[in-house]
Amino acid sequence: QKSSWQLLMSIQQKDILLGLFLTSMTIQMIAQSISPILPLYVRALGQRDNLIFVSGMIVSAMGVSSMLFSGWMGKLGDRIGNHRLLLIALLYSGCLYILCAQAQTPLQLGILRFLFGIGTGALLPGVSALLNRLTPPEGISRIFSYNQLFYYLGGVLGPMMGSSIFMHFGYHWVFYGTALLAFTDLIFLLFLFRKYLKVRDVRAN
């Protein structure tokens, strides 16, 4: 059995592999960046009663839409190419966060958070499918475990990023900063996928 280093060296598209790991981290960062400030932001939008319950519903809205649409997004990725779907989903997610900064009521924020979950439902299957295609069969479990490491790292960094932005710039800039992160990852992946934009599949060969 190959060592982890030998496995990584055997993968031809190492740059794309790193890009997918970083995208997994970004997915969690953009999903979790508003978690620390959400109850405060919901209160600033005018919610006084059942503040924690309403905040919880807004957080859950993303998970509900991801659950509803992830299967459909997986089929769409098979049809148009998972690398293309990743790019579209990152653009979509960044735009949704800009709209979240403009929300006037908790209801609007909840609807936008629900719509954001559709993008998450596209990102996660897309990354998994691409990793599966780029990785030798004997190394899939290890590569997926490394990908999970980056995903969980995003869950740590996202709330820290959101809290830091809030402390220095206020509520709205948490959303703008998160949108900027999504757009930055989009540009990075556009560079990595530049040779594959006209084809449907990205494969190891």
Residue ranges of model-derived segments:
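Juxtamembrane intracellular "pre-TM" segments in multi-pass secondary transporters
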Residues: 1-20, 204-205
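Pair of pore-lining "gating" transmembrane helices in MFS-fold secondary transporters
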Residues: 13-34, 114
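Short amphipathic helix-loop junctions that connect adjacent transmembrane helices
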Residues: 36-53
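Residue-level signature of mid-helix packing/kink "hotspots" within the transmembrane helices
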Residues: 63-71, 155-156
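Helix-to-loop junctions at the C-terminal end of transmembrane segments
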Residues: 68-81, 166
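Structural signature of the two symmetry-related core transmembrane helices
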Residues: 84-99
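Paired small-residue
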Residues: 96, 107-115
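Intracellular juxtamembrane helix-capping segments at the cytosolic ends
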Residues: 122-135
